[in-house]
Amino acid sequence: MEYDMQKRYVLVVLVLIFFVCSAGCSSSLPAQPTPTPTPTQVVPSTPESRTATVPPSDMALQLSDMNSDYIIKDRSVMISPEVTQLTHDLGWRQGYFVLFYRLNKDKDDQTFIRQSINIFPLENMNKVFSIEKEDMKSGSNGSSTFYEIPFPTIGDMSIAFRGSLTNDPYDFVVYTVLFTKKNVYEKITMTGTTTDYETLKDITQKAAEKIR
């Protein structure tokens, strides 16, 4: 009987030793390393330039921007003698213009669209726009009468007029849009026997989108 009890005691001890060893072996296994997350590369965005980065000729409207019945009558860079002394005083740097023409002899219909593009120092843009706007409102040259009309906002500053030339025997309607974007001042004029306010809005928006 005592032998059986000793045998059982030894068996219990061996079982306990087995579990202790098992636990010790398990705890001694190296822990799996926590994967280090790969840092996300943040690419800083390049701020948009506040001045135009393309030449004036690349900002000019193209035939593809117009209705199919228009042709290019003239286009060229502007030269210094073609701008006023006041324009020079405001820091005028360079300019470009394009003139589109549509003629339908059967209907005695002719229409002109002219775009002029002028580059000034950025700090003078408010002054340039204000002077040109007041000049249109006052009709300082005495040869035209213009009234401001509603027009979608174009670029940074914009305004539109409708009027006529005082001594024009044909009494053509004249639309004029002035707008600035970055360091660019533009003037777009539409006149003739057939003028279209909606077409003017469309091409003016296209002109603004070319300034980048």
Named regions from a protein language model:
Residues 153-157, 179-185:
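Short, solvent-exposed coil/turn segments at beta-strand boundaries
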